[in-house]
Amino acid sequence: MFSKLDAVESRYEEVNMALQRPDIASNQTQYRALMKELGNLEKIVLVYRDYRKKTENLKASKELLTAEQDAEMRELIREEVKELEAELPDLEQQLKIALIPKDPNDDKNTILEIRAGAGGDEAALFADELFRGYVHYASTQGWKVEMISFSEGNAGGAKEIIASITGDSVFSKMKYESGVHRVQRVPKTEAAGRIHTSTVTVAVIPEVEVSEIKIPMSDVRIETMRSQGSGGQSVNRTESAVRVVHLPTGIDVKCQEGKSQSTNRERAFQILYAKLQQIEDEKARKEASDVRLEQIGTGDRSERIRTYNFPQTRITDHRIGLTIHQLDQVMSGSFELLIDPLIANFQAEALKKQVSA
């Protein structure tokens, strides 16, 4: 472990030196990439240096304790030794976690897609509620949510919502939300008080840079139309809404929330790029023999990941067998109650894998 940490520290120093060079400073793309790398390395290096310093202090304190004759001083030194011995295991655990291979998409912004599944109107209502919960959660994380497309349900709610979430390490947390979310509750229109079950599908896709993927324009069909509001009525006299269809795959993307056609066209292509990259990533994952060890669930939109039982205010995450009775808090934005245990479980499994290797 320590040889790896030494290598990380060496790379940190290299990047720091490179950022001082005029040729790097004048190349904004390279400069931003190195600054991002420096930030990631610094998190590890600071903990490593703290660990190293406290290890040295512990050794010195133990030597001092052996040589010290004064009873009062010996007691003070013992307290210092006790504190250091209590702190070091936690720092060592932090370092082990920091060395877990990182998902290359973790730092990326995301495209969030929520679609009503089985359950008709009730599914559409929950899709909208789930999105609002994510918006509140994003706010607590300092992220920005921007609506891309919204299709209203027949009785309110949403048949489909597409939004972008931008900020610090969005995908690293939101990726755990991909899959089928099942809701159990009594609809307001249900006179007999029977519990209905409905589903909502969530897809979280990492955004990609335009330069990362190339699409021949002959493979794309672009259509323009007027933006539609509630009930399908036109809300724009100009054809600002844009639909982009990728002919080889059949991927169909529509954007209408932007004020101009150019804005909607740009966003539509960003979503298309992200979806095409996701297809490539899924192919690569299927070829890997240890996919299930490297992630919690497949992230596949057909996988049932969670059940929300409103009568019992209970949420169960089926991937790790987690059950909590804090449904109201979660739907108000406290998704960390679910996401943080998922991250901790992933880290524990990854550490087991490192030990067995």
From Swiss-Prot:
A single GO cellular-component term on record: cytoplasm
Modified residues (N5-methylglutamine): 233
UniProt xrefs under InterPro entries: PCRF, Pep_chain_release_fac_I, Pep_chain_release_fac_I_sf, Prokaryotic/Mito_RF, RF-1
One Pfam family hit: PCRF
Cellular location(s): Cytoplasm
Name of protein: Peptide chain release factor 1
Keyword Cytoplasm: yes
Function noted in UniProt: Peptide chain release factor 1 directs the termination of translation in response to the peptide chain termination codons UAG and UAA.
Signal peptide annotation: none
NCBIfam families, per database record: prfA (TIGR00019), PRK00591.1 (NF001859)
Gene3D superfamilies linked: 3.30.160.20, 3.30.70.1660, 6.10.140.1950
Gene responsible for this protein: prfA
Assigned protein family: Belongs to the prokaryotic/mitochondrial release factor family.
Maturation and modification: Methylated by PrmC. Methylation increases the termination efficiency of RF1.
SUPFAM superfamilies in alphabetical order: Release factor
GO molecular function, one term: translation release factor activity, codon specific
Keyword Protein biosynthesis appears in the UniProt entry: yes
Major subcellular location class: cytoplasm
Keywords: Cytoplasm, Methylation, Protein biosynthesis
